[in-house]
């Protein structure tokens, strides 16, 4: 999970820059981001002595690592240094997994997300967030089509009545149907709700299609607000055993 964690360090800095009014601090943050990214590129990628990004994680085919795409695109936008965009392009070329090309599957709609080799919902959504950012810079309509198809397929097969996904832990599992089956297990992760709302927000900003806003509203008022703990409840680890 090293690359996954590094992604959020970089995103945290990147989004903070947008609201930071201290110009000296902003320059310092950009320098830190560049050092962070340069170190990653020295160790990860194609070439002798480097590790393929999909092999930097032992789970989910490396989808979690590939989701670092988004901050590399944003760093390119901050610096105009093409090496960061090139690294982003390398990540896209992997298809976001060592043994299944998510990009091509969504571009051509050959399978639904719950039918993919790896079905971890949050991480998969994060990869397509990055792909949308990459599209905004590159302009290749195939990338936008793949993101739109991904979202449409999630809405068709893995979007529940309350506006979340995954009735098997944190995995896509055709939950549009599976939600009708009784279960007292862990399901419909709030991280999935929030990440999908983020992706829908970005897709609306790019396309202007108001249908994405409708789904944001559904997820927000139901899955997200319903998950807020306003009664100071405690929980036994991740087993879902809740008491006051």
Regions found by a protein language model. Name each.
Residues 1-244:
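Glycan-recognition and catalytic cores of secretory/periplasmic carbohydrate-active enzymes
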């Amino acid at each position: 999970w090293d690359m996954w964690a590094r992604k959020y360090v970089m995103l945290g800095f990147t989004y903070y820059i947008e609201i930071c009014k201290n110009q000296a601090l902003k320059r310092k943050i950009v320098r830190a981001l560049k050092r962070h990214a340069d170190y990653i590129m020295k160790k990860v990628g194609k070439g002798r002595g480097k590790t393929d990004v999909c092999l930097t994680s032992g789970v989910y085919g490396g989808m979690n690592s590939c989701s670092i795409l988004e901050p590399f695109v944003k760093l390119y936008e901050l610096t105009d240094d093409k090496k960061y965009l090139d690294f982003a392009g390398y990540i896209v070329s992997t298809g976001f997994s060592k043994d299944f090309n998510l990009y091509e599957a969504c571009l051509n709609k050959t399978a639904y997300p719950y039918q993919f080799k790896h079905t971890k919902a949050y991480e998969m959504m994060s990869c397509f967030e990055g792909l949308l950012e990459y599209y905004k810079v590159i302009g290749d309509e195939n990338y936008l089509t793949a993101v739109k198809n991904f979202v449409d397929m999630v809405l068709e097969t893995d979007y529940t009545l309350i506006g979340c996904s995954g009735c098997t832990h944190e995995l896509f599992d055709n939950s549009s149907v599976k939600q009708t089956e009784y279960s007292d297990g862990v399901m419909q992760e709030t991280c999935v709700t929030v990440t999908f709302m983020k992706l829908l927000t970005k897709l609306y900003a790019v396309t202007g299609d108001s249908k994405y806003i409708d789904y944001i509203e559904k997820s927000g008022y139901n899955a997200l607000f319903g998950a807020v703990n306003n009664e100071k409840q405690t929980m036994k680890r991740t087993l879902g055993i809740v008491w006051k």
